[in-house]
Structure formats: C-alpha cells, structure tokens
C-alpha cells in the first residue's frame, strides 16, 4: 500500500518510520527537506529513516490515496488553501481546535479530500518509531472507510480501534492537552502526585462536560482518544503540553518552535460559555493574568459541591 505522510515533525516522522518498517510504500513530505540532516527529523533525534522511506519537499510526489496529515492544527487551513495535494482520504493526526474558525482538524481537511478521518490516542512519536506496542483510535464518519483504514494502518505493534464519533475523538485529543498543561504546572510547582491525580479526575469531568455539549458520545471520552491520552500526557515529561505547564510553574522556557496545541485550545475554551474552570485557569496562567499561586487559589476557592 502507498501512503503519504505530510509533515516531518516528531509525530509525522514517527509514523513514517513505523509504516515504512512495516512494509508500506511511504512518502514523507517535509516543508524543509534540507533540515532533515543525517537521515532523521530534528524533532525526533536518534530515529533514523529506514531504507525505502521516500523523503520529499515536492507535494506533487505525494500521490497516494491515503495521506496522514501530521502538521499542527493551526497550520492546516493555510496548508489546504495552498493546494497541491489531492488524496482520496485525508487523515488528521493533529490534536487541537483551529483558533480562527473554532473547527477541528477534519472539518479543515474537508476541502482537501472527499473522505476525512482522525487518528488519535495515547502515543508518543518515539514509542511509535521504536515499534513499541501502541493502541490508537481511527475515527471516521463512514464506517466502511473507517474499517478499511483500520485494516490498512494497523501493524503488529500499532493497533487501531474504530469509531464513527469524530467529534468525540477530536475533542478528546484536543482537550486532554489543556489538562496536561495544568498537570505540568502542578508538578513544576511541587504540589505532588495526589494533587495531580485530583486534577486528572476533575479535568476528565471537565473534558466530558464540554465534549458532550458539543455532540460527542460519553463513551468516546472514556476510550483511547480521551481518558487513555489524558493519562499518558499528564504523567510524562515527553508531552510538550506537560513540559509547557511545568515551565510556566518554574519560569523556564521551552525550545523555540515547540508546538503547544493545548495553549490555543485553552484560550478557545476560556472564550466559550461552557463551564471550564481548569481551561480558564490555564489560559489565564499562560497569558500572565494569573501567576501560579493565583491559579491554585482560583481553583481551590471554587464553591464546594457534590462530585
């Protein structure tokens, strides 16, 4: 099977490496091919591209029916507008909400391909590239297309589960980033694992409230794309969102160019009428209207209520 992977950041490179090793005919498109020095992505150091993986900066070389779009959510609309790619199926690998339109990734990709899907779930690029066991969700409104993608994109170490709840899968991946920022801040401030556990539980309740209000199914949020991804990113410094929250609490900075999707999502939620106290606090903390002590006080001073 031919497969195009658009975007040579950490996740795109990880997927391209995994699928090339699994025997697929993979073409990896990079915006800056010259930056891929030494046969690897600078965003995923130590993981060399296998023989047979085609790397290009020319979109016209990407002719597969299925394209995995592994670019940040905030870059998707601009990429689609430029044209040059016309797959039959465009699979988003981004986890966010577009700040200009408020749309999820698959809605942005609808102008690119007649069929869209969302690949999401608990996964770090390095684990995928190393061939470590990973389970993901492939969400597609068309059940037959979803099943076909599941069969085509599952490997001995990468297991895919299907759902038709695209909204739930997209929002699970986007919202958990916000909670991961908060979890990073909790650990960076030295508040302990008990506080982090409480945050994860209340954060999951916040995710579920928001997502179901937008039409998601509750059971989707309890699956890989919601709870599974939340547990992973709130518990590991491999998560960029977790590291960002940690840096907010300690006064450190992340490397220039680090993508933090959860920051944009937090701002979207803070501007919405939904009850999202954790997202509101993360947005205020990131924007400097609250410091870490003020953020903690803000959350702990909320009215007591039943769980």
Swiss-Prot record:
Positions that bind sn-glycerol 3-phosphate: 95, 121, 123, 176, 229, 239-241
Function in brief: Catalyzes the reduction of the glycolytic intermediate dihydroxyacetone phosphate (DHAP) to sn-glycerol 3-phosphate (G3P), the key precursor for phospholipid synthesis.
Keywords for the protein's UniProt record, in alphabetical order: Cytoplasm, Lipid biosynthesis, Lipid metabolism, NAD, NADP, Nucleotide-binding, Oxidoreductase, Phospholipid biosynthesis, Phospholipid metabolism
Localization (cell): Cytoplasm
Reactions listed under catalytic activity: sn-glycerol 3-phosphate + NAD(+) = dihydroxyacetone phosphate + NADH + H(+); sn-glycerol 3-phosphate + NADP(+) = dihydroxyacetone phosphate + NADPH + H(+)
One Pfam entry name: NAD_Gly3P_dh_N
Active site (UniProt): 176
Family affiliation: Belongs to the NAD-dependent glycerol-3-phosphate dehydrogenase family.
Official protein name in the record: Glycerol-3-phosphate dehydrogenase [NAD(P)+]
BP GO annotations: carbohydrate metabolic process; glycerol-3-phosphate biosynthetic process; glycerol-3-phosphate catabolic process; glycerophospholipid metabolic process; phospholipid biosynthetic process
Gene Ontology molecular function, alphabetical: glycerol-3-phosphate dehydrogenase [NAD(P)+] activity; NAD binding
EC number: 1.1.1.94
Top EC class of this enzyme: oxidoreductase
Record-linked HAMAP family: NAD_Glyc3P_dehydrog (MF_00394)
